[in-house]
Amino acid sequence: MTKDDYVIICGDFGGVWNKDGESKMETSVLDWLDGKAFTTLFVDGNHENFDRLYAYPVEMWHGGKVHKIRSSVIHLMRGQIFELEEKKIFTFGGANSHDISAGILEPDDPKFKLKKKVLDRGWEPYRINHINWWKEELPSEEEKQEGLKNLQKYHNEVDFIVTHCCASSTQAIMSDGLYKLEMLRMKIRVNVCFQ
């Protein structure tokens, strides 16, 4: 293998997570990946620290926007098309957290400790804003529009789609119609979709 070989992680990478900056564990894992004989690529999932991830400078790489975490550990941003090995790869990370039915707590809420204690006692699924949940888990309108614009450049035809979550059309089949067909899946001609 060489650095021109790619391992692609379909979201929930976990290598950029600690709220206080890069921890010793993260440094160790990221340096280990960077030292491998391949390049690690990832799209974001819904369990990412978006404050830290989005703080990396945006760079162009193989035709699309990325965050370079290390020289060979690269976040493929949403709505981008990358040309690798003469293949067109459309990336669109993110997803809606399903483990937040009890809500999102605000750490600066005066009743935070009480609310957390009640939820913990009842084993209720919740998240804490900017600690283990970020609104950026879902794509912004700007990211959606950029994805559509980039797809139009390629006449809505790509070889691969890399995402974190399955298409809403797949969810619709599995959920007995609970989800509606999404705009992108209805327009794109694709050979393979990885999620």
Regions found by a protein language model. Give the residues of each.
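Active-site-proximal loop/helix segment associated with metal-binding centers of metalloenzymes
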Residues: E85-D176
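Proline-aspartate-enriched helix->loop->beta-strand connector
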Residues: V158-T163, L181-Q195
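Core catalytic region of metal-dependent phosphoesterases/phosphodiesterases
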Residues: M1-L84, K180-L181, K187
